[in-house]
Swiss-Prot record:
Coiled coil: none annotated. HAMAP family: TorD. Keywords: Chaperone, Cytoplasm. This is Chaperone protein TorD. InterPro entries: Chaperone_TorD, DMSO/NO3_reduct_chaperone, HscB_C_sf, TorD-like_sf, TorD/DmsD_chaperones. The lineage of its organism: Bacteria, Pseudomonadati, Pseudomonadota, Gammaproteobacteria, Pasteurellales. PANTHER family: CHAPERONE PROTEIN TORD, CHAPERONE PROTEIN YCDY. One of its GO terms (biological process) is protein complex oligomerization. Its main location: cytoplasm.
Length: 207
């Protein structure tokens, strides 16, 4: 049996009491959905039930309401993939007064932003991570921040993960999620995803 200090070192003492691999999987799944819109093939996987085990897992962790709301947005509808692509653009890609811009620098300012950007640069250098040139993503895009977090979960003590989460994500995600919920979209898939993302991360890194 692992001692308390060993559990902390391995990152197992997160508030959700789930494994490193489970945490990484959930964050990787969220990251992929925030990076680009769903393809028709990916949408088909959801509608065939290929993600039902993930949804059941999230419900078991206590995120039943958020998960059910997300599932409801995936019910078949005419031209669904096109609607989802349009919703992705409306939610994340328009001007900041219309969309939920997925960049840390759109929400943080001054010293708080400087501290966060320095931390991001530090870990990007440490892990030799580069930005996605194809997607033209700056280093403060939420998907880049999640890529760093996923690496930290696998390799760093929990307090290091928590420091990054609090300084580079949790201090602006609530406003990001609020704006995502206020966008005018047909399916609300991305708003519900953002709600689940914030709920999961808040619980995962609860003090």
């Amino acid at each position: 049996m692992l001692h308390h200090n060993q559990m902390v070192l391995m990152g197992l003492l997160n508030m959700l009491k789930i494994s490193i691999q489970e945490r990484q999987f959930v964050y990787s799944w969220i990251c992929s959905l925030l990076s680009k819109e769903l393809t028709q093939d990916q949408l088909a996987h959801y509608q065939r039930g290929d993600f039902d085990s993930l949804f059941a897992f999230l419900k078991e962790l206590g995120f039943t309401e958020q998960t059910e709301q997300l599932i409801a947005t995936l019910r078949p509808m005419e031209f669904q993939q096109l609607e989802l692509a349009a919703d992705f653009a409306h939610t994340f890609l328009l001007e900041g007064n219309i969309s939920a811009i997925p960049y840390m620098s759109a929400y943080l300012q001054g010293e708080e932003l400087g501290v966060a950007l320095n931390l991001v640069d530090q870990w990007m250098t440490h892990y030799q991570l580069g930005v996605n040139r194809e997607q033209n993503e700056p280093s403060d895009h939420v998907s880049v921040l999640l890529a760093i977090l996923i690496r930290l979960i696998g390799e760093q003590p929990f307090h290091v993960q928590q420091d990054f989460a609090q300084k580079a994500l949790l201090n602006w995600l609530p406003e990001f999620v609020r704006k995502a919920n206020n966008t005018s979209c047909e399916t609300k898939f991305y708003a519900m995803l953002c709600n689940l993302f914030l709920a999961f991360m808040t619980e995962d890194f609860a003090v």
